[in-house]
Amino acid sequence: MVNLGTPDAPDEGSIRRYLKQFLSDPRVVNLPRWLWLSILNLIILRVRPPKLVAKYKLVWGTKDGPIRNITNALAKRVSSLIPGVPVVTAMTYGNPSMSNALRQVSDAERIIVLPLFPQYAGATTGAVQDALEQALANSTGRYMIDFVDEYHTHPGYIDALAVSVEKSKAYRDGTPRLVFSFHGIPKAQADSGDPYPLQCQTTASLVATRLNLPKDRWMLTFQSRFGPAEWLTPYTDITMGALPDQGIHDVLVVCPGFSVDCLETIEEIKILNRDIFLAAGGERFTYVKALNASWDHTNVILDIINKYQK
């Protein structure tokens, strides 16, 4: 089970090492290498880490941070339902690495690799494929590999998202506008044929249909843009600042692309975007937490795995 990654600790050095690995990947930033690496090393890695320390400390919790903690908890639950089948975790960037995961299952003949990204994007699932290929090249093992590209229409996944919305008190006692906020990607990547935006739209539409929501009760936005280039729109933060002027004062935000809560959901959505919405005149902002290590999520993962075990 593979997630994106996280610094080893909420300190400047750990954040810098993580960002260097993450932002050096051409899958993440597709600019001429000489230009981008100069910007990265001379500017970004000097300026960004000190600014991110407080943000990471805000969401960190226990020693391993939310992504690693929750991913490991999810893996433990999945493992409890398939005794005899080793379930290990890896991160595309940071620790535990893909190579470390392969070492843990070195005696296996067949491996199911499940990136925890329901919607395929070259910058996420594609990067997992790259990391896997590199780890396999450096491994002495020979494995049959089953790779799960995406599961954005999986019925259990759609139902689990809908149930998480239905459990919200704000949804049960009101008529909030439901906002599906997905991590954005540069528009240029989408224009080059990345299926990600269409898969995001499909997931959101399926959940809205499952909830019997008319089109004027939900919307889709994209968050976490980085740098000056145009990313997928509409932007979540800009939308939050504009909704109260459109007469929408009650929103319920869910982030279907994030399998577990992390900096981008806890700090960016639950705190920053809430502040933007309320400052603009909004009255109630509710964040629906990620599926995390819930049993609903566990059963989705188990069903995906079982299809590959047959």
Where are these regions (language model features)?
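Active-site-proximal alpha-helix that buttresses catalytic centers in soluble enzyme cores
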Residues: 1-310
